[in-house]
Amino acid sequence: MLSIKFINDNRDYVRKALENRNFDVSVFDTLLSYLDKRGAAMHDAQIKRSELSKLSRQIGSFKDDKAKMNELKLQAANLKKDVVELEKNADEFDQKAYEIIISIPNISLDSVPVGKDENDNQVINTHDNLGRKLVSNVLPHYEIGNKLDIFDFERAVKLSGSRFVVFKGAGAKLARALQNFMLDLHTANGYKEYSVPVLVKPEILFGTGQLPKFKDDLFFMEQTNMYLIPTAEVPLTNLYNNEIIDLSQPVRLTGFTECFRSEAGSGGKDMKGIIRSHQFKKVELVKITSEEDWEFEFKQMLEQAKLVLEELELPYRELQLCTGDLGFSSRTTVDLEVWLPSELKYREISSVSYMGDFQARRAMIRYRDDNNEVKFTHTMNGSGLAIDRLIAAILENYQNSDGTVSIPKKLIPYFGSDKIAY
């Protein structure tokens, strides 16, 4: 959430930044109108209060002149009514302004390329890490998975409908191996592991920016007034909701959760396989830092997410998102996309995003600086990584000509064998 002071002090800058993010600037202009009216009402109320204070002092000097005293008392009563009315108006404009402010996305860093949509994203680097030769005619992950009997889509439909998957046998084992491998990798590099609830209160999703704007993308449990989390970013960041925390060292968190998304608006995209499911597995990385530390910590988080792909020897690329493709809460985002040879294209497997103090303002996460001044923290998060898509990438990039799938070397100790066979 942007601060009112920042908006008022940088109106032209914010307007242009929102325009670059494809935000309807007429809504922003309405916000400015409400802020101006709120400011005017508060200013007028202050003038009336000053007049009332002056009048109250005068009343005492007319004790012997009841007519004059009554006249002044009447004026004072009218001034009080004016103050109450002006303060009421200010509160109404303040509420209207707030309702718009919580719908306004974050302001991108000046270094983020201006663009309309995903077509304007910029490739930073491409990493051809695969230490083996691909077989010809690579089967899609869902076909090789069915042949190896590690998925059961039919029974998933029976249980829950479309966009769900049952992992079984070596498939379930591979998912568990990846989870443990990534958590070990992250905790060895300074992240503290957490196991968190997947059901959270509405105010928790507000804190990280999913509510109210993305309500339709979430699964709501009406009987409990709670939501299933779309990512562990939500509970991990909000562990410190409404707290003043010690930031003598940056807070570094990791955790595995099931994640849930309604995929509203995705239409018929990716109906086959495990690329886009209502429920999926993911290991998340979250950091809470000071403003001074964010850049170093962001670069380190990106390297940590990349390390998973490097260790698994999977080909991938880094993509700097443009202004028009940034997430709601993000100031800058680098996507990591893994190569899927059956599709001859890269697929997102991680988004590493820096949020500034945008989420901290919504969630009221604060710290004391060296001068004991209370400030909002800065937050960042990234997938570390999405397990279902990792499985798809391994099944395609590690296929063998005999129909088996090799296991990446670093994963073998976790999986217990070097391949998945019939």
Swiss-Prot record:
<feature type="binding site">
    <location>
        <begin position="231"/>
        <end position="233"/>
    </location>
    <ligand>
        <name>L-serine</name>
    </ligand>
</feature>
<dbReference type="InterPro" id="IPR045864">
    <property type="entry name" value="aa-tRNA-synth_II/BPL/LPL"/>
</dbReference>
<dbReference type="InterPro" id="IPR042103">
    <property type="entry name" value="SerRS_1_N_sf"/>
</dbReference>
<dbReference type="Pfam" id="PF02403">
    <property type="entry name" value="Seryl_tRNA_N"/>
</dbReference>
<dbReference type="Pfam" id="PF00587">
    <property type="entry name" value="tRNA-synt_2b"/>
</dbReference>
<comment type="similarity">
    <text>Belongs to the class-II aminoacyl-tRNA synthetase family. Type-1 seryl-tRNA synthetase subfamily.</text>
</comment>
<dbReference type="InterPro" id="IPR033729">
    <property type="entry name" value="SerRS_core"/>
</dbReference>
<keyword id="KW-0963">Cytoplasm</keyword>
<keyword id="KW-0648">Protein biosynthesis</keyword>
<dbReference type="GO" id="GO:0004828">
    <property type="term" value="F:serine-tRNA ligase activity"/>
</dbReference>
<dbReference type="InterPro" id="IPR015866">
    <property type="entry name" value="Ser-tRNA-synth_1_N"/>
</dbReference>
<dbReference type="GO" id="GO:0006434">
    <property type="term" value="P:seryl-tRNA aminoacylation"/>
</dbReference>
<dbReference type="GO" id="GO:0005737">
    <property type="term" value="C:cytoplasm"/>
</dbReference>
<dbReference type="InterPro" id="IPR002314">
    <property type="entry name" value="aa-tRNA-synt_IIb"/>
</dbReference>
<comment type="subunit">
    <text>Homodimer. The tRNA molecule binds across the dimer.</text>
</comment>
<feature type="binding site">
    <location>
        <position position="284"/>
    </location>
    <ligand>
        <name>L-serine</name>
    </ligand>
</feature>
<keyword id="KW-0030">Aminoacyl-tRNA synthetase</keyword>
<dbReference type="InterPro" id="IPR006195">
    <property type="entry name" value="aa-tRNA-synth_II"/>
</dbReference>
<protein>
    <recommendedName>
        <fullName>Serine--tRNA ligase</fullName>
        <ecNumber>6.1.1.11</ecNumber>
    </recommendedName>
</protein>
<feature type="binding site">
    <location>
        <position position="383"/>
    </location>
    <ligand>
        <name>L-serine</name>
    </ligand>
</feature>
<keyword id="KW-0067">ATP-binding</keyword>
<feature type="binding site">
    <location>
        <begin position="261"/>
        <end position="263"/>
    </location>
    <ligand>
        <name>ATP</name>
    </ligand>
</feature>
<dbReference type="InterPro" id="IPR010978">
    <property type="entry name" value="tRNA-bd_arm"/>
</dbReference>
<dbReference type="GO" id="GO:0016260">
    <property type="term" value="P:selenocysteine biosynthetic process"/>
</dbReference>
<dbReference type="GO" id="GO:0005524">
    <property type="term" value="F:ATP binding"/>
</dbReference>
<comment type="pathway">
    <text>Aminoacyl-tRNA biosynthesis; selenocysteinyl-tRNA(Sec) biosynthesis; L-seryl-tRNA(Sec) from L-serine and tRNA(Sec): step 1/1.</text>
</comment>
<keyword id="KW-0436">Ligase</keyword>
<feature type="binding site">
    <location>
        <begin position="348"/>
        <end position="351"/>
    </location>
    <ligand>
        <name>ATP</name>
    </ligand>
</feature>
<keyword id="KW-0547">Nucleotide-binding</keyword>
<dbReference type="InterPro" id="IPR002317">
    <property type="entry name" value="Ser-tRNA-ligase_type_1"/>
</dbReference>
<comment type="function">
    <text>Catalyzes the attachment of serine to tRNA(Ser). Is also able to aminoacylate tRNA(Sec) with serine, to form the misacylated tRNA L-seryl-tRNA(Sec), which will be further converted into selenocysteinyl-tRNA(Sec).</text>
</comment>
